Amino acid sequence: AKMCTEAMKNEMFRSIVSTDATTIQVQRNGQQADVKLESTDVLLGNYDGACGVKTGFTEKAGECFAGAVQRDGKILFAIVLDSSSEAQRFTDATTLDDWVYNNTIDYPLVHSDETTTYTTSTGTTATVPVVANVSHSGWMDKTFKATLSDPTASVKVFSLDGNVSQDVQFDTVSGDVKPGQKVGTVTFYQHNEVIAQQDLVAAETCPAPNPIEGIGIWWNRLFAGFSGEQTQAESSVVNSTPLIYGSNATINTTKEG
């Protein structure tokens, strides 16, 4: 699999192994002759996304096949050794491929029952899910709603790799806040690997305190600091990451058909 991974990075190699048939010209008895070459990879043109790589046979490894399938921009390799026949090695490979694809799901990045509506810079209204409530550093008690830069986005994940988690990093926000303004970053992980990352953006306006309000807030913070009281509202995460694996899974990973 590692050899295939590296080899398929070469565009010429990929072009050759993904071709099911071609004709080349050779010299034969002093004249040019056409020779038709046909791949022994029967999956090419017959299995969605099949793009190589190599059939083979050895006494110790038996009927072999290193298969590659590309879907949604990602290549999946199925390596088969010691299959029972030439035909069976392809069935073995597609069985492995199908198992992976049947356990691959579209996982929405946003899971939030709370929504908010705001007016965009073009004058249209937009209703979006609330991902977090973000603290405004200019105030002691104010937060504003935020969403993802693309709240409809999803990512394909292999469900058996484990559940998805999120890490929300909030920016220090000051000044007037307008919808669409970046106020943080949300990173999504599966099995300790980053699977998606998006900007956290404001989903409503939040004016900064005016100079008079700012003076009052400064004094209030001073007194609050002496008494150990909170001097700024805390940001909070609204979005959840439902389980996709295990007995408590809440997302259905069973595919129909």
What are these regions (language model features)?
Residues 1-257:
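Domain-terminus/edge residues, biased toward the C-terminal soluble/receptor-binding domains
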